UniProtKB/Swiss-Prot annotation:
Pfam families: Med4 (PF10018). The lineage of its organism: Eukaryota, Fungi, Dikarya, Ascomycota, Saccharomycotina. Component of the Mediator complex, a coactivator involved in the regulated transcription of nearly all RNA polymerase II-dependent genes. Mediator functions as a bridge to convey information from gene-specific regulatory proteins to the basal RNA polymerase II transcription machinery. The Mediator complex, having a compact conformation in its free form, is recruited to promoters by direct interactions with regulatory proteins and serves for the assembly of a functional preinitiation complex with RNA polymerase II and the general transcription factors. The keyword Phosphoprotein applies. One of its GO terms (molecular function) is RNA polymerase II core promoter sequence-specific DNA binding. Residues 205-284 are annotated as: Disordered. This is Mediator of RNA polymerase II transcription subunit 4. GO terms for biological process: cellular response to heat; positive regulation of transcription elongation by RNA polymerase II; positive regulation of transcription initiation by RNA polymerase II; regulation of transcription by RNA polymerase II; RNA polymerase II preinitiation complex assembly; transcription by RNA polymerase II. PANTHER family: MEDIATOR OF RNA POLYMERASE II TRANSCRIPTION SUBUNIT 4. It comes from the Eukaryota. The modification N-acetylserine is found at S2. The modification Phosphothreonine is found at T237.
Length: 284
């Protein structure tokens, strides 16, 4: 082998080592990714283009270029150029795949929630009594009701009616006039109807109507002083001898007014005595 041949072999081996670190070589290192990418036509054309190019470079390094390899490289390049146009379609497929994955995750979460709710409903349903038990309890209640005779109910009702005699063990002091539902006579006299009858004019007065007031004749102060002087001269008592009323006289006057008011109220109570005797002891 000549010196040129040895140099060409060394150069070709160096080129092979440099090409081993290419993108395709790194992708082939992973078996899983290789299985997925091998199904793509673009990946196959790219691998074929790289292999053909490496063969052509090797033949050129040996100073023996092969035309068949060059033609094959041209055909591979044309096919690769045609398949590059499919990258947009692959991009759309990838986006649709991401959307489908997102929808799948949402459906999984919804399904998980539905299963949890169904599990809770199952536990609640399991805690409820069975239909047979409910029907059994219903039948027992109906049987107990059917055992009660109507004559017994009527006999018990006659014991409670007011036409029967009071049992000997009955406490007469338990029920009195204070326990009846209707009001007593005193409460009726002090009720709203009795108070309304006293103030009928105020209650029946039309709103906005002025209250009629008795007119009091007004006397000028000069005339009132002259009249007082004349009365003093007739009585023969000087003005200096007039009595000075203090608080004691006022208290006596207030007590007299209070006694008069009480007498009026008693007279009004006597006038309102309508003989409303609603309690009849003979009925019991």
């Amino acid at each position: 082998m000549s010196v040129q041949d040895t140099k060409a072999v060394e150069f070709s081996m160096g080129h092979i080592r440099s090409s081993s670190v290419s993108l395709v070589a790194e992708a082939t290192s992973n078996t899983n990714s290789e299985d997925k990418l091998s199904k793509v036509q673009l990946y196959e054309d790219l691998c074929r283009y790289e292999d053909t190019l490496s063969k052509l470079v090797e033949s050129v390094d040996r100073f023996k270029p092969n035309l068949d390899i060059a033609k094959d490289l041209i055909r591979t390049d044309e096919a690769l150029f045609e398949n590059v146009k499919l990258l947009a379609e692959y991009d759309n497929i990838y986006r649709n795949l991401q959307k489908i994955d997102k929808d799948s995750e949402e459906l999984d979460s919804k399904t998980r929630k539905i299963l949890e709710i169904l599990n809770e409903c199952h536990d609640e349903l399991k805690a409820l009594p069975m239909l047979e038990q409910v029907e059994f309890e219903k039948n027992t209640i109906l049987q107990q009701r059917s055992k009660i005779n109507s004559t017994e109910l009527l006999d018990y009702a006659t014991k409670l009616s007011k036409f029967t005699k009071i049992p000997p063990t009955f406490d007469k002091g338990a029920v009195g006039p204070n326990n009846f539902i209707w009001p007593a006579e005193d409460a009726l006299r002090r009720g709203m109807l009795a108070m309304a009858s006293l103030h009928s004019k105020e209650l029946t007065r039309i709103p906005g109507e002025e209250v009629e007031e008795t007119e009091v004749p007004t006397v000028p102060p000069s005339q009132s002083e002259e009249q007082k002087g004349q009365m003093a001269k007739k009585e023969g008592t000087p003005k200096t001898d007039s009595f000075i009323f203090d608080g004691t006289a006022k208290e006596v006057g207030d007590e007299a007014d209070n006694t008069k008011d009480k007498e009026k109220e008693e007279n009004n109570d006597d006038a309102l005595d309508l003989d409303l005797d609603l309690f009849d002891p003979d009925d019991f």
